[in-house]
């Protein structure tokens, strides 16, 4: 959170919510926050619907929010560092990339563990996770289109970034 606060401060933004006035950002935010599931530990043990919703939420958030959605932003921020601009941001982004990568990896690992423990989850969640993947790629494409409205950056091309999220 400190890194993102520093980023907002460096960019002259008073708070995170300033970003939500951009439709491409608001759509991503709305989708990702709509995937959360609020169940207790006891619910997971006794309620198959709770397990399915938590597994789905975990997979979507871990793989797509922390594994896809942030990386185009990281790439753009790194492009500034490569041009010796926004110098303090570069190190913050390195730490954030490491942190988000661990979150993504561990969340996906936890999802796989849940599927090992409850094998029916994979089939129950597969379709909704696939649809979520398609949607997040589209939302991220919209976000990249917004970033590059005025053309490619000096050392980062839109098509390269699109290729990154379509892998």
Task: List each language-model region with its residue ranges.
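Alpha-helical bundle segments that constitute or directly flank the non-heme di-iron/ferroxidase center
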Residues: 1-2, 55-80, 102-106
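Long, hydrophobic, well-ordered secondary-structure blocks that form the structural core
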Residues: 1-46
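Inter-helical turn/loop segments and adjacent helix faces that build the functional surface
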Residues: 6-16, 45-57, 75-95, 109-127, ...
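Alpha-helical interaction elements in eukaryotic regulators
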Residues: 89, 103-106, 140
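Transmembrane helix-bundle signature of multi-pass membrane transporters/permeases
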Residues: 95-100, 131-132
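Primarily interfacial, aromatic-capped hydrophobic alpha-helices that serve as membrane anchors
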Residues: 128-160
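Conserved small/polar residues in nucleotide/adenosyl-binding loops
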Residues: 165-167
């Amino acid at each position: 959170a400190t890194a993102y606060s520093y980023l907002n401060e460096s960019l002259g933004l008073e708070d995170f919510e300033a970003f939500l006035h951009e439709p491409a950002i608001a759509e991503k935010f709305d989708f990702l926050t709509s995937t959360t599931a609020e169940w207790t530990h006891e619910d997971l043990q006794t309620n198959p619907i709770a397990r399915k919703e938590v597994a789905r939420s975990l997979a979507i958030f871990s793989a797509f929010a922390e594994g896809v959605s942030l990386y185009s932003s990281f790439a753009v921020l790194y492009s500034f560092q490569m041009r010796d601009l926004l110098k303090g941001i570069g190190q913050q982004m390195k730490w954030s990339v490491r942190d988000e990568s661990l979150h993504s990896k561990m969340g996906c690992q936890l999802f796989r563990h849940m599927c090992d423990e409850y094998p029916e989850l994979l089939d129950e969640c597969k379709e909704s996770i696939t649809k979520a993947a398609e949607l997040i790629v589209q939302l991220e494409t919209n976000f990249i289109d917004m970033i590059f409205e005025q053309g490619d950056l000096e050392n980062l091309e839109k098509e390269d970034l699109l290729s990154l999220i379509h892998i």
